Structure formats: C-alpha cells, structure tokens
Amino acid sequence: MGDEDKRITYEDSEPSTGMNYTPSMHQETQEETVMKLKGIDANEPTEGSILLKSSEKKLQETPTEANHVQRLRQMLACPPHGLLDRVVTNVTIIVLLWAVIWSITGSECLPGGNLFGIIILFYCAIIGGKLLGLIKLPTLPPLPSLLGMLLAGFLIRNIPVINDNVQIKHKWSSSLRSIALSIILVRAGLGLDSKALKKLKGVCVRLSMGPCIVEACTSALLAHYLLGLPWQWGFILGFVLGAVSPAVVVPSMLLLQGGGYGVEKGVPTLLMAAGSFDDILAITGFNTCLGIAFSTGSTVFNVLRGVLEVVIGVATGSVLGFFIQYFPSCDQDKLVCKRTFLVLGLSVLAVFSSVHFGFPGSGGLCTLVMAFLAGMGWTSEKAEVEKIIAVAWDIFQPLLFGLIGAEVSIASLRPETVGLCVATVGIAVLIRILTTFLMVCFAGFNLKEKIFISFAWLPKATVQAAIGSVALDTARSHGEKQLEDYGMDVLTVAFLSILITAPIGSLLIGLLGPRLLQKVEHQNKDEEVQGETSVQV
C-alpha cells in the first residue's frame, strides 16, 4: 500500500520532459490518478472520485436547467415564441375559420347549425387524439390517436348539453364518411406493390386470407344466432370485423423493426405486407354482401347480382386506371397535383355514383382497382401523389372517427344488445387468433413468434370505421325501419370492436414484441464495438 502511494506521488510530481503542457494532458493525468485510486480499494469510492462525479453531475444538470429557463424566456417574450405562440396561432385559426364560414352561411354556423356541429366535432376529435397521444407508457408504443377521436365523438353525442348544440344532419355525416372511405381505398390501392404481389410467399397469402375469411364466417354465424340478423347481414357484419387495422399495426411494427426485433425472420415486414391484402379482401367481401343484401328477388338472382357488381367494379376501375396512367402525360406542368386530383375525384365519384345507380358494392372495388393500376404506371411519381393523399387523410381522419363515435347513442342501446355484441366480438377475435396461429405453422417460425403474430393480427380500427356505417347509411336511403335496425347493430359492433381491440392490440404488440421476438445479433455486436471504441477513446 505504501509503495503504491509513493509511486502515485512520484508520477504526479514528475517534471516536464520538454512537451507542451495542455489542459487535455492534465485531464488525462487526473483521470488516470482517479482510476488508480479506485483500483486500490474498489469497494469504497475515494474522496477524489466523489468530487469528480459530483462535478460531472452538476455539468449535466446545468444545461438542462438553462434550456428550461431559455424556453420560458422565449415563451414570455414580446412577441412570444414556442408553446404560447402555437396556442395563440391555433386558437386564431379556429376562430377565423368559424368567422369566415359564419359570414358566408349565417345561421348554419351558429350553435345548432349543421356547419357549427361539423367544426366542433372536427376540432374536438383532433384534441381528443392529441390528449390520448400524451398518455405514454414506458417501453410501450403510444396509444392510437384514432381512439381519442372516436371517444370525442361518442362524448359529444351522449352529453346532453353538448348534443343539443352540436347537430349534424345524417346526409352530411354519410357524405363525409363516404369521402373518407374513398381516401382510404385510394391509399390502399396505391400502397399495393406489384413486385411484392409476384414474390408473395405462401405464408403471406395464408395470413391475409385465412383469418379474415374464418372470422367473417364465425361472425356471420354468431350474428345470425345471437343478434338475430339475416344471413346476408351476418356476412356484412363478418367482413366488417374481418379486417385488421394498418393504423395500429404498421406504427407498432416500425417501432419493433427499428429496435431489431423479429427482423431476421421478417416478422414486421410480413405483417405490414399482409395487412393491405387482408383489408382489400374484407372490403371486397363487404361490398359483395352489401349488394346482395339490398337487392330484391330470388337468392340466385341476388348472388348473380353480387357477382355482377364485382365485374362492373373491376371493369370500370380498369378503364379509369389505364386512363389516368397516360392522362395527364409526363410532360405537363403540375403533374403530381393533376394526378392527385384525378385519382381522388374519380374515387369519390365512383363511391357516390355506385349508390346512386343501385350498385353500392361496385364503387369500392372500382376505386381499389383504379388506384392500383394508376400506381403501376406512375412508378417514381407515385410517392409524391401518396404524400398529398396522406394530407387529405389527416384532414378526414378526425371527421371519420368522430362521426362514427357520434352515431352511437347510449339511450338507443339495449343492454342485452351490447352484451351480445361484445360476446360476438370476443368469440370472433378468439377464433381469429387461433386461425392465425394455424396459418403461420410450417413457415419457419418458432413457438414464440407464432404467438406474437397471432396477437399482433388482432387490432381493428380504420376499415371498421370506414365501412361500419355504410350499411346503416344505405339502409336509411331505403327508408325501412327494420333495415336501419340491422345497420345500427352492425355499426355498434364496429364501434365496440375498435374500442376494445385497438388499445389492447397496441399494448399487446408493445409488451410481447421485445419478449417473444429475437433481436438481430449483428446490431448487438455493433453496439458492443461502438461501446469499446468509445471507452478506448
């Protein structure tokens, strides 16, 4: 012990050998001294090490406190910046929007008016989504904002004071939801990759088709015997429930993929790719069953009419898709804007006109086929069109989920109906989980990965909100009370499926992903190498 102290003292007092004495050399010498003092007695920190740690801690805390003070000064400055500036700006925009519409429409934009209700619902849905996004749990993905939008609309409808002043006509509500459905279908069609379609493995096909079809058939069976729906309406309900939600699955998969979980087996890629095909299959089945349910005549005629709607939708979509591949041509100005307007305008026209001409199931198929063929021809420009359509979706997403929530009234719900709807959703989801597990067997996944994929294929949201109210809107256009009751049951089940499965599915993916999926080994090695390099430096 004494020899070591003498050696340390000698090294500290050693004279310079002609080299320039710099602060960095002094820091290195000080760090070596502290390390050697630690080596003498590793269990008890020395006074020097304690002082060094406290000084480092103060240096780390000082910039943080300075940042908070600087932000506060910017916020309270004149003119203000930061949070206060954003709040004032957003409030001004909201008030200005209302004032401009009021100056044009008058009483329609006052409390109780139609436009007033739409504006209030729109901003309340946005605020609801933002508030839900503030709920952050450690090591878990954030809750989907669409859930906050859904709850905002539900609260507006079921709080008497607010409901008396926020009134939206059924025709306006139906039209806005149909526009949102058109945007979703365009995004789904453009999102399909023709090269990926050719390279799809059997497991991706099984995953996109098997659970959707089995859940649709199970839900139809349950709806017929538990809810008393006719078989046509049972399958409408089944295909509403059969779709998985990309709005929940894709962000969660991207988080896991960024962390390196399941990348080696391609689990996130598989789920994101199969999700699009799962949704398209559900929408196609829904449109076909919708056409059959609202057609009159014999069963054979209804089935043939459903097939005819599919043929009309595919044929019309093919013609329009090839048309907008070449018009406008690539040498025109503002090419992306023109293509975006054409694909959105034609999709909205297809959805509305199909209902007008008595073929409600053909509009959605027409939009899907048209967007897919247009995207194949646009190649590199497709991404720019998708960006603009994503902005349109950001505008209509709060309206869609807010309007879906506002359709559900507690006063009109019977307790036994709610219980049967929850039972239908629960049993159908359980069958879907088991079917998904079977579909990924013999695909090279281990038991933990199969369990994760089964639970990750659970969330429902976007498609249920988009098509869940279409049957009710179509029933209202026919003016039959019994059909409206069937449509209300379908909408209630869709609402409950979003409310139950969206948060549970998101939490399960965040909890089970790091525990059941393997992390890529080379990422860990890279981190270790980087750590060793930083220590050596």
Swiss-Prot record:
Q: Which reaction does it catalyse?
A: Li(+)(out) + H(+)(in) = Li(+)(in) + H(+)(out); Li(+)(in) + Na(+)(out) = Li(+)(out) + Na(+)(in); Na(+)(in) + H(+)(out) = Na(+)(out) + H(+)(in)
List residues modified as Phosphoserine: 49
**Topological domains annotated Cytoplasmic:** 1-86, 134-144, 190-200, 243-270, 325-339, 374-390, 441-461, 510-537
Residues in compartment: Extracellular: 105-113, 162-171, 228-233, 291-300, 358-361, 412-417, 474-486
Which keywords annotate this record? Antiport, Cell membrane, Cytoplasmic vesicle, Endosome, Hydrogen ion transport, Ion transport, Membrane, Metal-binding, Mitochondrion, Phosphoprotein, Sodium, Sodium transport, Synapse, Transmembrane, Transmembrane helix, Transport
One of the GO BP terms on file = sodium ion homeostasis
Positions in coiled-coil regions: none
Query: Which intervals carry biased composition (Basic and acidic residues)?
Result: 1-10
- Molecular function in Gene Ontology: identical protein binding; lithium:proton antiporter activity; metal ion binding; sodium:proton antiporter activity
Membrane topology classification: Multi-pass membrane protein
Give the record's family classification.
Belongs to the monovalent cation:proton antiporter 1 (CPA1) transporter (TC 2.A.36) family.
Q: Which PANTHER family does this UniProt record tie to the protein?
A: PTHR31102, SODIUM_HYDROGEN EXCHANGER 9B2
Question: What's this chain's function?
Answer: Electroneutral Na(+) Li(+)/H(+) antiporter that extrudes Na(+) or Li(+) in exchange for external protons across the membrane. Uses the proton gradient/membrane potential to extrude sodium. Contributes to the regulation of intracellular pH and sodium homeostasis. Also able to mediate Na(+)/Li(+) antiporter activity in kidney. May play a physiological role in renal tubular function and blood pressure homeostasis. Plays an important role for insulin secretion and clathrin-mediated endocytosis in beta-cells. Involved in sperm motility and fertility.
Under what name is this protein listed? Sodium/hydrogen exchanger 9B2
**Source organism of this protein record:** Pongo abelii (Sumatran orangutan)
